[in-house]
Every structure is written in C-alpha cells, then in structure tokens.
C-alpha cells in the first residue's frame, strides 16, 4: 500500500497499490479510498495511515502486504539507507525514480523467495529513553495509558513492555512488508488495543491530540 492524502507523484510499479487515506468527506484523488467497504476512514485525523491498513485488512486478501507512504519508500539497493525519501522523489525526474523503484522491487521479491517473513525499517537508537523521547515530543500520559492497556489485555507482555519503555531502541515510520498471516495477526492484536485506549481515554477525560493513535501504533 502507498498511503497518501494528497495528489502527488506515485510509481506505476504493479507491486504498489496507492490508497487515498482519510478520503471520507474529501475531494477524490482518482484512487481507491479508505472510505469504501468496511472502513474507519472518519478516524484518519487520529489514526493516520492506519485507516488504510484497516481498509486493506477488511477488504482485500493477498499473500504479502506492506505499507509505505507517498513520500517514503523502502529502498533495497543501498546499504547505507533503507529509505527512498521525499527529497529524492523529484517529479521532474520520474523516469530515473521509476527505474530505481523497479530494481529495488525485484530485490524485494528475492527476500520473500528466500524465506523471509517480514521486513521492517532499520531500528533507530535514541540518546534518551523510549519513554523520554515520547515525553519530549508528545504527551507521556498517553504512552502510559497504552502500556497499561496492553498489560491488562495481554499480561504476558508486561516484562517486555517494561524493558522497551526503559530502552533506547525504536522502529519509526509505521512501515513494514510481511506475509498475510503475520499481517492478520498484527491487525487482530493492534486494533482492539487502540479501541480500548480510545475508550479509556474518553472515560478519563484526557486531553485530545491529533494523530495520537498513529503515534502510539508506531510504538506498539
């Protein structure tokens, strides 16, 4: 999936499936919208690209699935950087970009034919703790609420969560590629957690922040 909320250059490679996220109530982009079929498109201001993932989970079936963004793609050609970022996606140089993405996609296929189950971004290592980074950039009470919710729903995760919150390792960008079984398991785990966080946050009357569940899912 390529999650996009605006008109932008998109690759023509058939491995990529652009989807208009947050399409509900917006002008069409000429792409399939996350407001069709079984959807949560209205939650996009809070859930970000997750509304596209939810749409895919409920409305399509494929052997492998992944998520990238209209300004960021996995890059399997360079060893120094795992991403093709928006600064390099020059609409005036689409021929070279298409060629790069095509070769990169061929390398991607080799990963799965070699037996890999999932591909993730390279981990980032923070100078401050996992919790400290969230406190610096967001509202720490929301991260604590998320951790408590996971502990209550899945008690076996408690030790791991404690280690992660105190650690310095994180996977940013909400990007991955995996087989459908892993994807289905992940979605079946993630969305009940987010639903419960949303319910608890409402009951506790905690302040509202846009994109909250996108930020939390990146940590989950």
Where do the protein language model's features map onto the residues?
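ER/Golgi luminal nucleotide-sugar-dependent glycosyltransferases, focusing on the catalytic module
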Residues: 1-220
């Amino acid at each position: 999936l390529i999650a996009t909320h605006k008109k932008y250059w998109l690759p023509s490679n058939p491995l990529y499936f652009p989807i208009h996220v947050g399409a509900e109530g917006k002008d069409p982009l000429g792409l399939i919208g996350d407001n069709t079929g079984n959807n949560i498109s209205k939650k996009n201001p809070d859930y970000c690209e997750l509304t596209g993932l939810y749409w895919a989970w409920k409305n399509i079936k494929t052997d492998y699935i992944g998520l990238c963004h209209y300004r960021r793609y996995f890059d399997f050609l360079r060893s120094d950087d795992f991403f093709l970022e928006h600064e390099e996606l020059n609409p005036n140089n689409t021929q070279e970009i298409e060629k790069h993405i095509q070769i990169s996609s061929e390398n991607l296929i080799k990963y799965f034919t070699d037996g890999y189950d999932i591909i993730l971004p390279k981990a980032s290592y923070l100078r401050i703790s996992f919790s400290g980074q969230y406190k610096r950039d967001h509202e720490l009470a929301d991260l604590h609420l998320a951790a408590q919710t996971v502990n209550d729903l899945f008690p076996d995760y408690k030790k791991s969560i404690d280690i992660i919150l105190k650690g310095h390792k994180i996977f940013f960008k909400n990007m991955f590629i995996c087989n459908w079984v892993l994807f289905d398991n992940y979605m079946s785990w993630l969305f009940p957690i987010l639903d419960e966080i949303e319910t608890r946050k409402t009951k506790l009357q905690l302040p509202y922040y846009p994109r909250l569940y996108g930020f939390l899912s990146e940590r989950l």
